[in-house]
Every structure is written in structure tokens, then in C-alpha cells.
From Swiss-Prot:
Keyword Disulfide bond: yes
Keyword Glycosyltransferase belongs to the record: no
GO MF assignments: toxin activity
Domain remark text: The cysteine framework is V (CC-CC).
Chain residues in the propeptide: 20-42
Taxonomic lineage: Eukaryota, Metazoa, Spiralia, Lophotrochozoa, Mollusca
Modifications made to the protein after synthesis: Contains 2 disulfide bonds that can be either 'C1-C3, C2-C4' or 'C1-C4, C2-C3', since these disulfide connectivities have been observed for conotoxins with cysteine framework V (for examples, see AC P0DQQ7 and AC P81755).
Assigned GO CC terms: extracellular region
Listed name of the protein: Conotoxin Ts5.5
Keyword line: Disulfide bond, Neurotoxin, Secreted, Signal, Toxin
Amino acid sequence: PNPLERRIQSDLIRAALEDADMKTDERSVEGVISTIKDFAVKVCCSVSLKFCCPTA
């Protein structure tokens, strides 16, 4: 490949790697939010606020 083709390939690879990193970060953030939400529900329910307790 000529230098321009090499640079384009390199840029595409770099962009793909950055995209993959972003997706991992999004999953991590979603996991943290889910954990915080679960904890908040347990705390809310433990202080006898029945409106926030999960119905079983």
C-alpha cells in the first residue's frame, strides 16, 4: 500500500479500537448505575418506605 493507504488503514484501526474502548466504558457505567440503584432500593425499603420496595 502507498503511504496514504497506510495512513487510512491506521486511522481506521485506531478508530475501531477507540470505539471498542467506549463500548466497554458504557457497559461499566451501566453496571455501576445498576449497583447504585439496587443499593438505593434496599436502603429505601429498610427505612420502611414501602413505596420503593420491590413487589414480590
